[in-house]
Amino acid sequence: MQAPHPLDLARVNPDDFDIRCFDDELRTDELCVRLLHAVRDRLIVQGHPPQEAGELCGGADYFLRDFVIAECGDNLLRLPAERVRQFAGHWYIVRTLEPNRQELARLLAGVAACYRVLAESALVEPSRAEAIAADCADIDWYEERIEAFWAIEDDGFTAWRNACPLPPPRP
């Protein structure tokens, strides 16, 4: 199997990442892979060792493809402000066998790096990338959420869930 050809970041059309139906989701998932290859290449040019650049994009991949695209149906270039907190403070915790600070920090480092490159490429507003980076850096709060999840007793899940709710289910 041949590796996907990276997208040319200068020629990306944000509208191509809109998701209105299942076919759009499949197309967007493929575009996301190609986008992440381009981000990886840009990180390498910026001085990141290839393995580190790949690991950063791996973290962004999980967030973008499994949560933003598949779960939320969002355009990753028009990401709602609350998505990082919903991912790290809820979705990751309930979808991971053993959620932990170290793994989550690696994932979020990739998300922040990816959105920094997207901002540098004028694909997202710099203020959006900065807000995403700030949410990615709030690892102490996410660790508190993990600990609170493991401490849930009786009907405490509802209160835990309501403190950081997920977006409504897609139609």
Model-found features: residue ranges?
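Exposed alpha-helical structural elements
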Residues: 31-34, 38, 83-87, 131
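Non-catalytic DNA-binding core/recognition domains of DNA-processing enzymes
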Residues: 49-120
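Flexible interdomain linker/hinge and immediately adjacent N-terminus
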Residues: 2-22, 131-171
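Amphipathic alpha-helical protein-interaction segments
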Residues: 106-144
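N-terminal "first-domain core" detector
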Residues: 8, 12-64, 68-70
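Surface-exposed polar/charged interaction patches
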Residues: 38-49, 63-66, 70, 94, ...
